[in-house]
């Protein structure tokens, strides 16, 4: 069994010096879309256009819990080996949002992969598929 650890502090792994040249998505900052571990970014304009479109449709901010991940960060958080987060995917907090409205806005914005959890929704543009993080999440989402 391989154990991966990282002893860097948050200030060391999240520098505020991510270039913003060409950044056109007013509701999101490059830092929140980059890897929380090393600040690596993956620039995918079509994905960001769709995310901005979903945000515009909802008309309220939403919190990105996780977006791009480097392979080490993905392993540290227990992500799937071929996770869409290795390119670009988002986990969006459900706090303050109607889950059904958020899902519908993301679906209409051309997201195709959805993971349903009790406190967040995962959205990506990989192969079309859906899953529930837990039995409790399945019950929660099927009631909405």
Which role fits each region the language model picked out?
Residues 1-57, 127, 138-144:
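Extracytoplasmic cell-surface/polysaccharide-interacting catalytic and binding patches
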Residues 2-7, 81-144:
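Catalytic cores and adjacent binding grooves of peptidoglycan-active enzymes
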Residues 18, 30, 74, 109-111:
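Compositionally biased, low-complexity repeat tracts
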Residues 22, 72, 77-81, 118:
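Solvent-exposed, flexible loop/coil residues
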Residues 35-37, 62-67, 93-97:
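N-terminal start-of-chain detector that recognizes signal peptides
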Residues 42-44, 69-73, 92-94, 100-103:
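A short linear-motif detector with a strong N-terminal bias
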Residues 46, 59-61, 94-95, 125:
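Solvent-exposed, well-ordered amphipathic alpha-helical segments
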Residues 48-78:
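Extended, low-complexity, intrinsically disordered C-terminal regulatory tails
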